[in-house]
Amino acid sequence: ADYIDEDVLAEFPEWYKEQTGEDIEVIYQVFDINEVMLTKIERGHEDFDVVCPSEYIIERMIRKDMLLPINRDFGNTPDYIPNLSPYIQDELNKMSQGDKKVTDYAVAYMWGTAGTLYNTEVVTEEEALECANLWNPKFNNKILMKDSYRDCYGLAIIYANKDRIEKGEVTVEQLMNDNSHESIAKAEEQLKLMKPNIAGWEADFGKEMMTKGKVWMNFTWSGDAVWAIEEAAEVGVELDYVVPIEGSNVWFDGWVIPKYARNVKAASY
């Protein structure tokens, strides 16, 4: 529910009518994880007009011909794509499928990292920086993991290959995109070993548990971490966030129009 400013949702119908002369109602729905949204569209043919999945889901939707190209020539609102960070633009371009450019199907919205949110009273920065400490028995039942397959898989496969990363034999990007049976088995093994330390798999309740001191570390997204740090500070709890020194996932979210959309015009706006 924190993903879009409520004022934007409230003001959009009025702005849309100014632009088009047409009335519209915004029905806003959120999903805990990307895969739930994808299943509703792919199998249930849900007629969402516009959705905002992460980069790996966008890539999959383009590959499966599930998206409509976006008409960028509309209204009086300038398209910000030409001013996009070169780094983000390069990363987005990697998701293109053959002659299908990702920028024809997606508009970048947010980006960030996956890392460790930690309580500075009980966890040092040095401990938070090392992936190995998420497996440390010292933190038995004191760690939350984001309920995200890609991020948990990434953490586990990076940790399993940390020596190879240090030697320069493999990159984090290569590991994140390796879905071989061997790599999946390695990640599964590491996640099983981590199980005694896991207090829960969270989609949205991590901020509350960290603020109340029920857990000490949360492997989460940078956006959620910032929100949690601000909320915790209001009640005198000091939290901080770091990206593991071994490396981690960089995520991108973007707006796309599913092919089952009923109001493509409004979705483009």
Label each region the model flagged.
Residues G115-V122, I158-Y159, W251-N263:
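A bilobed periplasmic-binding-protein/Venus flytrap-type ligand-binding module shared by bacterial periplasmic
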Residues I41, M209-T211, I257:
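Hydrophobic residues within well-ordered alpha-helices
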Residues K142-S148, C152-A156, R164-D240:
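Ligand-binding pocket segment of bilobal, Venus flytrap-like solute-binding proteins
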Residues V122-L129, N161-G168, A261-A267:
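Short helix-loop capping/hinge motifs at secondary-structure junctions, enriched
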Residues R43-C52, M66-L68, F139-N141, K212-T220:
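Alpha-to-beta junction loops
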Residues A1-K64:
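Early extracytoplasmic/lumenal segment of secretory-pathway proteins
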Residues T220, D224, E231-Y269:
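Extracytoplasmic/periplasmic substrate-recognition and gating elements
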